[in-house]
Amino acid sequence: MDSAFMDDIAAFPLPFCREPMSSISHMLGAFVFAVMAVLLIRRGRGDWVRTSSLVVMAASSVLLLILSSAYHLAWPGPTRDFLLRADVAGIFLLIAGSMTPVHAILFTGRSRWLTLVGIWSIAIVGILFRMIFHQWVSDAVGISIFLICGWGSLATAIVLWRRFGWTFIKPAVFAGASYTLGAIVLLFHGPTIIHGIMGPHELWHIAVLSGLTMHWRFVFQFASGLQISRPRLKVIHYQPATREAA
């Protein structure tokens, strides 16, 4: 799997940076989302479950961007090899972190906790497998696992669509589409817009930033809590007609 993320990155290096565009894009992204995290977490104050779930999503997003930026900054060697494994493992963290506030805030009972336990169990296994057995995972298998994990939330999207409507879930759907398109570009190693500057991996980074932006926009809708408005039934009182006195 390493080749999809490292060996095929054809970038013009700088003295201090192996892949400038990839590193700088996610470095700036980490800064922007760190600032946005303050606003997001403040929006969720007042309930510990809500606030904690927003912290998890914000931390997983920023951490992934930092790991990615550091990996693309480094030159070949043991440090870069480790950062590569951590960077790819961070995608599992991002998927689970992104789903955490969705189920923690919008669901209750078993729909909340059992789903979160399942999501995080898969993420932990994926992270451990990626860090320890990375050399046994091919490009296609690795990227397919990410797509399956990400689109595993389709059932959640359907439930939210039926409950709140298309306008509510539209940012989340666009986020999923952005991640998917980026993964496809990465898997097929194309297209290349400007050789050495804007290739498949740089396009993947843009897709990640776009997906994060849309998903955060989605979560901002209910970060402070969401009251489900249900239409009230109109009660019609039946009054039998009375005959007029003859």
Set out the residue ranges of the language-model regions.
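Multi-pass alpha-helical transmembrane bundles in non-GPCR membrane proteins
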Residues: 1-246
